[in-house]
Amino acid sequence: MAQFTESMDVPDMGRRQFMNLLAFGTVTGVALGALYPLVKYFIPPSGGAVGGGTTAKDKLGNNVKVSKFLESHNAGDRVLVQGLKGDPTYIVVESKEAIRDYGINAVCTHLGCVVPWNAAENKFKCPCHGSQYDETGKVIRGPAPLSLALCHATVQDDNIVLTPWTETDFRTGEKPWWV
């Protein structure tokens, strides 16, 4: 029978501890690396505005400058920007000098399609299932069960800042469903 020599077959404790720590560190690093994007997904992005608001962004991701915005749009225009939580939001041009004090979330309340503005008919029409909303985003024809969500739109330092709308919905006189 072969003779067993302890010194050749069993590594010393220092080496064993080192290998255990190396394995633990590798597994921990991989686990943290995999969890980081998941945790980051649940943390809302910062819009750079004060008071919980988000600065409106154009399709390229740049801040919308009100002075240039009003020069290039006419009264009554509804223009898509990136708004609260990254949702597409319409900014309503009131005149060549001002925007309305609210923005309209462009996500249909039926199945989540982006609802385009139809200037010829003066209403929003969902391309997915035909829901229609008036110029303020109030539902006028289903299957959408609710009006489009609102947000406050204010001008600060030539930027459009969007903040959550928590007051009574002026279109329905009811508490907002999106709060």
From Swiss-Prot:
Membrane protein topology class: Single-pass membrane protein
List S-S links within the chain: 113-128
Q: How is the cofactor bound?
A: Binds 1 [2Fe-2S] cluster per subunit.
Q: Which reaction does it catalyse?
A: 2 oxidized [plastocyanin] + a plastoquinol + 2 H(+)(in) = 2 reduced [plastocyanin] + a plastoquinone + 4 H(+)(out)
Query: Where are the membrane-spanning stretches?
Result: 21-43
According to its UniProt record, which cofactors does this protein need?
[2Fe-2S] cluster
| Ranges in the topological domain labelled Cytoplasmic | 1-20
Enzyme group, top EC level? translocase
The record ties this protein, via SUPFAM superfamilies, to: ISP domain
Q: Which residues form the Rieske domain?
A: 61-162
Q: Does the keyword Glycoprotein apply?
A: no
Residue intervals on the Lumenal, thylakoid side: 44-179
- Single GO BP term: photosynthesis
Q: Which Pfam families does the annotation name?
A: Rieske, TM_PetC
Q: Which UniProt keywords apply?
A: 2Fe-2S, Disulfide bond, Electron transport, Iron, Iron-sulfur, Membrane, Metal-binding, Thylakoid, Translocase, Transmembrane, Transmembrane helix, Transport
Q: Give the residues the record marks as binding [2Fe-2S] cluster.
A: 108, 110, 126, 129
Question: What Gene Ontology molecular function terms does this protein carry?
Answer: 2 iron, 2 sulfur cluster binding; electron transporter, transferring electrons within cytochrome b6/f complex of photosystem II activity; metal ion binding; monooxygenase activity; oxidoreductase activity, acting on paired donors, with incorporation or reduction of molecular oxygen; plastoquinol--plastocyanin reductase activity
Q: What InterPro entries does this protein map onto?
A: Cyt_b6_f_Rieske, Rieske_2Fe-2S, Rieske_2Fe-2S_sf, Rieske_Fe-S_prot, Rieske_Fe-S_prot_C
Which subcellular locations apply to this protein? Cellular thylakoid membrane
Q: Which PROSITE patterns does UniProt cross-reference here?
A: RIESKE
Sequence similarity = Belongs to the Rieske iron-sulfur protein family.
Other known facts: The Rieske iron-sulfur protein is a high potential 2Fe-2S protein.
Question: What function does the entry list?
Answer: Component of the cytochrome b6-f complex, which mediates electron transfer between photosystem II (PSII) and photosystem I (PSI), cyclic electron flow around PSI, and state transitions.
This chain's protein is named Cytochrome b6-f complex iron-sulfur subunit
| Organism encoding this protein | Mastigocladus laminosus
The gene designation is: petC
